[in-house]
Amino acid sequence: MPLPQNRSKRNMLHKGTPMRKTGKVIAIVQARLGSTRLPMKSLLCLRDVPVIDWVTRRLAQAAKLDGIMVAVPDTPLDRVLMEHLQRRGVPCVAGSEDDVLARFCLAARTADAGRVVRVCADNPLIWAGAIDRLVDFYDQGGWDYAYNHIPRNNLWPDGLGAEILSRDLLEELDAKAAQTSQREHCLNYIWDNAASFKIGTFDPEEDWLRRPELKLDMDRSDDFCRLALKPIHPDMDARDIVRVFG
């Protein structure tokens, strides 16, 4: 089946050594309990299931992933989250709270990732199908970085997808990113220097999935309340999710 047409406006090739697209594909989930906008959000429950379990459970259905690693801050508060993940047998690692890029790289090294899929822990409705399509799109194109987690130059709902880049590029970002914003928001260096990278995205194939106005993530308390009031469950497929939020 042909891949959806790229809609990226960023098409300049990365200047430097081509990034290898080999090795294990690892989803790294950035999770924490210290959010100021929605404290403890990773352990808040939707339908009696903690949000972090929604994310890891739904990611486990992705055929293109070789593993999952959760990256949490090394704070006393987040030790509760680490213990929760360890009890469930979910691989996890603790790193710097403020230097998220360093923590992300630590997780990639710990998991021996070759390609890294970045996932936000506030996306409880993340869809395995979106992850698989993203990996295929990235592998079959000449992209340095690709994404479908937000409706930027594409028609995806907000919160179903992710971002992907090579471990080589991630290590390069770690070496070059000097601004505080680039360390805290770990892939900002790419967007700050977009002319130096080939950035790709694509549309969903299905008309019913082309819903960029839908917000499915859980960033604030009102997002949590909206999700909590919907008849959703952790194994729900994308068509039913779109129908419920329609």
Task: Give the ranges of each region predicted by the language model.
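Short phosphate-binding loop-to-helix
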Residues: 74-139
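N-terminal nucleotide-binding beta1-loop-alpha1 segment
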Residues: 19-38
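Conserved core of the sugar-phosphate nucleotidyltransferase
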Residues: 88, 126-213, 244-246
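A short, N-terminal amphipathic alpha-helix
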Residues: 51-68, 87-88
